[in-house]
């Protein structure tokens, strides 16, 4: 069985590799996407990637996921801590959701410790660097498989 997974990235992630590499690493978003594609092939999954610095774009992609995606992997970035609108959009999605953060948001500034998205996420992966995306893909295919067999 093949699964379609939306991978949604929020603000400033288009600058991976340039923005605070000591915190986020040296890989670009395109590098991350290439690595994810390789992982997805091993697990018979297809990916659709989205990135925007605009909250409304992320919401539109979450809405679109309802029509075709088996699961959503989302790194809402700074919107994690501020966006009830993204939480509300995710609440409408009926499949599994994995929230990914490159850094461990719980060891950073206090305002980053709370994520609205976590309230709806099936799982949260944080602090593994960009490898967190590949972990999320592996776990998402497990979750999608469990839903199909139950």
Segment roles from a protein language model:
Residues 46-56:
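Short beta->alpha junction loops
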Residues 1-5:
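Extreme N-terminal starter segment of soluble prokaryotic enzymes
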């Amino acid at each position: 069985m093949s699964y379609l997974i939306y991978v949604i990235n929020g603000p400033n992630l288009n600058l991976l590799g340039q923005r605070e590499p000591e915190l986020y690493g040296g890989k670009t978003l395109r590098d991350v996407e290439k690595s994810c594609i390789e992982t997805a092939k091993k697990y018979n999954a297809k990916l659709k990637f989205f990135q925007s610095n605009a909250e409304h774009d992320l919401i539109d992609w979450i809405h679109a996921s309802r029509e075709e995606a088996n699961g959503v992997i989302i790194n809402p970035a700074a919107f994690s801590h501020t966006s009830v609108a993204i939480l509300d959009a995710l609440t409408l999605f009926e499949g599994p959701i994995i929230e990914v953060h490159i850094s461990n948001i719980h060891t950073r500034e206090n305002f980053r410790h709370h994520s609205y998205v976590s309230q709806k996420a099936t799982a949260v992966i944080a602090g593994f660097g960009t490898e967190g995306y590949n972990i999320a893909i592996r776990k998402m295919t497990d979750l999608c498989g469990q839903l199909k067999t139950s």
